[in-house]
Amino acid sequence: MKIINKSTPCFVLMILALSSLFTRTLFAWSTGPEAYRTGAPNDKGTCKDSGCHNSFPLNSGDAKFSITGPTSFAPGETIKLKVSFNSSSGKLHGFEMTAMDTNDNQIGKFKAIGKTTQVIPPKDYRGLKKEDKGTYIEHTLSGNKKKRWKVKWIAPAKATGTVTFYAAGNEANGDGTNTGDYIYTTTLEITAASATFGQ
């Protein structure tokens, strides 16, 4: 008579479940990190702080990570911004960006350009709050094969003062794990144009 260990099927199912969860997590992060990982004030730091890509100190790689755009904007205007890696030897790259006013509150709305960027939707695996809809943008799965991304940002109709864009970037070695990758942060400040008409 063959004796079957009743705990064996449960153990196998547990291993399969954990393996599936690990695979989904790796795939999810390749399609864009969770929200609030730009390094901005009140964010949860970067992907390095989440324990995901923490092999090296922040901004310790040789690449140059930057945000470029206009120096000013008009209230209600839609402007274009570019997030870039230069002098990078990484095989895959990614980013996440948000914009904040002088009181460290999210400001404006982002809009994706093409298929390499996406506005983070609320209430999925990335954990974006409903009230922050439209305020975070990042790479897509196809976008992690790029080193440069263009996005749009729509200023509020009554925007004033200085807006600071915060971005975190991942320079990855493409080995399918979260080790050996460099995380960078950068900022860009632009100012709302003053209304001078009639003066």
Language-model segments: what does each one mean?
Residues K2-V12:
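Bacterial N-terminal signal peptides that target proteins for export
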Residues F22-I154, K158-G198:
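Sequence context surrounding c-type heme c attachment/ligation sites in exported
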Residues M1, M14, M97-M100:
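Detector for methionine-enriched segments
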Residues V12-L21:
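Bacterial N-terminal signal peptides
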